[in-house]
């Protein structure tokens, strides 16, 4: 059975061979995964929205390791805030025969990132998304992110310059 690339499975040896006992979640895009004795579903609008919700159900204890991005604001388990270290993994155990609801809230404030090798230039990120200025300025069809920064109108990089012609250009780095 194939599982989404966002997941990595954890197995353990049992009396009847290998058994799935957990998973590692690296990305928070909407998905569902069914295992023999558990299920996991992720809902939300990641990477554009500020929250992802993960529901885990299992017949036995089921371990979930969550990658905690640097732009994470907070994480809750069944409404209770958890302590976590950004840039690391958080271990959560779903008890047997229960459903757990994890919510991950992302900080989507704009962050400046210096250009590699030239700190005189800066790119702008919003959570996981790199932003760019499209030569069409505010008229960028299909853009899901619209931000103004230092007089520039920015959209997500994947939408900028999407006309694929000489007149439609994009800019990612700006003089700091």
Predicted features by range, described:
Residues 1-55, 85, 103-176:
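C-terminal beta-rich recognition modules with glycine/proline-rich loops and embedded aromatic residues
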Residues 38, 77, 82, 97-103:
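N-terminal and secondary-structure boundary signal
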Residues 41-44, 90-94:
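Beta-strand-rich interaction surfaces with strong enrichment in secreted/lumenal proteins
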Residues 55, 60-69:
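Surface-exposed beta-strand/loop patches in extracellular or lumenal glycoproteins
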Residues 62-65, 92-108, 113:
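C-terminal beta-strand-rich structural cap/linker in extracellular carbohydrate-active enzymes
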Residues 72-93, 110-117:
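Solvent-exposed beta-strand/loop surfaces of large extracellular or lumenal domains
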């Amino acid at each position: 059975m194939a599982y989404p690339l966002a997941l990595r499975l954890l197995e353990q040896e049992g009396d009847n061979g290998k058994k799935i006992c957990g998973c590692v979640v690296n990305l928070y895009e909407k998905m569902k995964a069914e295992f023999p004795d558990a299920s996991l579903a992720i809902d939300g609008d990641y990477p554009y929205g500020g929250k992802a919700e993960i529901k885990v159900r299992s017949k036995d204890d089921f371990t979930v390791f969550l990658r905690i991005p640097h732009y994470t604001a907070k994480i809750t388990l069944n409404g209770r805030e958890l302590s976590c270290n950004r840039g690391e993994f958080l271990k959560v155990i779903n008890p047997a025969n229960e459903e757990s609801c994890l919510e991950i809230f992302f900080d989507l404030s704009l962050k400046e990132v210096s250009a590699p090798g030239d700190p005189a230039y800066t790119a702008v990120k919003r959570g996981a998304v790199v932003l760019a200025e499209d030569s069409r300025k505010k008229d960028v069809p299909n853009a899901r992110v619209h931000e103004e920064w230092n007089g520039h109108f920015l959209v997500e990089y994947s939408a900028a310059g999407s006309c694929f012609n000489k007149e439609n250009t994009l800019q990612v780095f700006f003089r700091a």
